[in-house]
Each structure stands twice: as structure tokens, then as C-alpha cells.
């Protein structure tokens, strides 16, 4: 239960970042969804202008869709300027990081009895330490110098969320901030299907002064999603073995 609540909040913050900047840039968002993109739509929560807010069958992850078509056809995002597209893509991860900072301030004030100025500084320091630590773990993993021990899948995160919840509200909120920061940094990695991957592809377009085709985007994203599904399965297997060992 704690895992579902924490993960939903973190994903909502991330997708809202994309959503609000897209709206500001005049890019239409046709769906705002909580759940894995390719899982069936089970519920329409409400509608606002052209946006349908939905819940998918697999409630892990989330996305905003800039296309009217289920298969991700041409959308308004491709018509936006390079700058606006970069801002939209980076808004999700940055929202996670800002959210973590804002959440940690009351944790330090109410949970650890610090003064406001002390809490702000402690929050900023914590954000920096977690961000830099996450970057090191990710870099070491992809460079071959790290191990699986630094990674956690849904099962591992659920276990830690449960442990945090058992220690009280402030521990759970602190864990939420850490998860939010980790999600933000992970999404900035320049790999397919991640926000960082989209930004990297935009840089390629800017250098070659020619847009990549929609089919190229779809193929790259499909490959990226497949890779991350495989990684998720492997990490989840590791978490389960660790749990029952």
C-alpha cells in the first residue's frame, strides 16, 4: 500500500511537469495517464479541455500523450520548436527534483525540529548528496564498474517503502523524496524511451539540421522500452531472491 501511494505521487509529479510546460508551450496533451503505456486503459478519471486523464491496467509508471492516436501517430510535439521540446522533456525530471527539495523542508522542520533556514540548507544538501550518489551508481552500472546491488526494481522499492512506513510518516515522506530524486536523475540518462533519450535525439536533429522521422522515434522508443522491461524483470528477480534468501 505504501509503495503504491509513494510511486503514484512521484509519477504524478513527473508527468505533471511535462503536462504543465506542454500546455504553456501551446502543445496539446491528449492523455495524462498513470500506468504502463502499452497496458489497456481501464478507467477515464476525468477530462479537461482536450486532455483525458486515465488509469492503465499496469499502474507502474505513467505518461502524457501528445497524439490522438493510440499507436502514437504524428502529434503537436513534433511541430514545436527545439527549445520548447527540450523544455517539455526536461520538465518531468526537474519537477521530481524540485518536489523532493520542497518536501524535505517540512521533514526537517517538523520531523527534526530545525529552524526554517537550517531546514532549507539541510534540504539542499540532502538533494545534492542523493543526486550525486544516484549519478555515480548509474554511471558505474552502465560503464561496467558497478553491480546490480545498487539497483532496485518494484519489489525492492516496495520493501523499502514498507520499512519506511513502519518507522513513521516522516520516514515515509523522506523516502518519497529520495525516490523522486532518483526517478528524476534516471530519466535524464540519454537512453531510448527516457526523457534524456528524447533530448539526445533532439540534439541529433539540431546538429544534422533535419528532423528524424516519426518511424525512427517509434522504433528507438520501442527498443528502449523493451530493454527497460528486460532490466526490470532481471532486477525484480534479484530483489525476490534477496527477499526469500
Give residue ranges: language-model regions.
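Small-residue-rich helix-interface/hinge motifs
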Residues: 1-73, 189, 194-208
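Internal alpha-helical transmembrane segments
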Residues: 2-5, 13, 24, 62, ...
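Alpha-helical transmembrane segments of polytopic integral membrane proteins
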Residues: 10-13, 22, 26, 60, ...
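Long, contiguous hydrophobic alpha-helical segments, chiefly transmembrane helices and signal peptides
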Residues: 34, 63, 93-95, 134, ...
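Functional transmembrane alpha-helices
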Residues: 75-90, 105-183, 203-223, 234, ...
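Short helix-coil transition sites and intra-membrane helix breaks within transmembrane domains
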Residues: 146-151, 188-194
